């Protein structure tokens, strides 16, 4: 209570008297506080005196965020993020205004960093009592409390990522990553280790917290261990993936492998500033760390990705949903889980690799041999998703050296396309995460691959919707990708379908929950296709016995996907859209009470066909796959049982799931079928023929 009364005693003082008092305190506390704190505050008061005296109070429209894991929180330090359209000069003005208004209330604040190149905002050290004041400042979008991030580490690996037709000791991919620069945000690095000597430039950037505990001894080998090992995995002379890649080191983790979100943000801004001052070729940023979900961390990654930087991060070692952590949950980041030599998920004591829809793929992450900081010729074995992410960063460097013009979306699609598929035992994952987690282990592409005209597609799952009847789930593709089809999935089977709609100038896939349902997922099929032009044609409920029909009526447009949604709770059978391979392949047909949507696209050389596989009686799963040379763009269930849970694409296979038939009382008349729409570019066929 004494503190509160002392603060209030400052409040009625005239401003000149307050300035004198602050200057006096500055002299008295010169030994306790950093130089300039009080002078900075006085300048802020002087510059804002006229403007703030009569400033109106603003309603609190900004939001406050903090880490969901209490032990990782760092109260007292906050990232203040301004609105997207705010001019960069407003960052410093808003910081000064906050300091001045805080001083008028008897609080001291310290501006630790002003962001100019990464995002509009600043980092401030202040009392939590000032949050309400800060949230009301003009231009403020949101404020996030700082939190901790941690290193994620607790030669079969090189053989695993090498294409099967080669052996690790004889295959040397083209250029070895020499055209790419990799930034590593980690601990410090022993740059004179024989594995990485001459390959690593240690920058002067350092933003790390103090080590925990007064007895911690900062041995060089401890401070350098994590970063040195990962640098060796990325570009080591003997054990590295991309042996020709150059690497720059930024220190954001202390000797205990611990850092902060704010320190990492400043590191990312350092990279962005360097990119602006001296543009170079392709950049890969390796973030082998994880913290709790952070809106500002994810936003910073998004901005850097939009600037053309490829970011690769560890999924995390918490045997948990990767979407609960940052930067793993950022859609613009390539998130990597860890597998062992048998292609199984890595277990680390009671924990292990993270999983879920936010993971893009897995890579070797157990017992990885790499450079040790114990001596300049020592090696050590380490495990974790940090090591897995380092492998993918190396593979990305190799791919970008071979094709420097690749965008982030193109690189991600290639990483997925060339991965080893369906090799992970999904039983290791929690049951509700198995369908969401990609069964992919990273691999280098063959040296002779030609992907210029290939149609690449990937499946993107939404977050789970709420359980209310009107709840919806929404998923979107990356900026450079095209949404070619939309489907939905509900574990309870109670859903009201899905549709493609426009949102913010971008097409999204929206799925609808039903009354009594437990929630629904929206599933997008996101593809890369040059010069593509797509539209959605919708037919409202027909009310006729023949059902609702819609087709692609524009010349040159082909059907890439069908979807349907309905307002009534139970249509019985014939819920999903119907596609008939015979007669009219560009037509979708559905229940008479449902709206039917056809996704129709035009691109040079694009051709599509429909494949169907049905069974006379319901089973838990029905699949149909596209042939080699064709790419799955659409996946749906044909009319049949009302017990269908939904349909989704796994690589090039369409999967239709239903509830356990042993408990649903199904009859033999209730048939079900999986329908795939398979597309290809004729340019690819022609190019293949020319090579033969």
Swiss-Prot record:
User: EC top class, in one word?
Assistant: hydrolase
Q: Could you give one GO CC term from the UniProt record?
A: cell surface
What cofactor does this chain's UniProt record say it requires?
Ca(2+)
The superkingdom listed in its UniProt entry is Eukaryota
Q: Which residues carry this modification: Phosphoserine?
A: 47, 688
Broad class of where this protein is predominantly found: cytoplasm
**Would you list which residues are glycosylated?**
533
Cysteine pairings via disulfide bonds: 223-255, 323-358, 457-527, 477-526, 486-509, 534-601, 552-600, 562-588, 608-679, 626-678, 635-654
From the UniProt record, which GO molecular function terms apply? apolipoprotein binding; low-density lipoprotein particle binding; serine-type endopeptidase activity; very-low-density lipoprotein particle binding
How does the record describe its quaternary structure?
Monomer. Can self-associate to form dimers and higher multimers which may have increased LDLR degrading activity. The precursor protein but not the mature protein may form multimers. Interacts with APOB, VLDLR, LRP8/APOER2 and BACE1. The full-length immature form (pro-PCSK9) interacts with SCNN1A, SCNN1B and SCNN1G. The pro-PCSK9 form (via C-terminal domain) interacts with LDLR. Interacts (via the C-terminal domain) with ANXA2 (via repeat Annexin 1); the interaction inhibits the degradation of LDLR.
Protein name (record) = Proprotein convertase subtilisin/kexin type 9
Native species of this protein?
Answer: Colobus guereza
Q: What is the lineage of its organism?
A: Eukaryota, Metazoa, Chordata, Craniata, Vertebrata
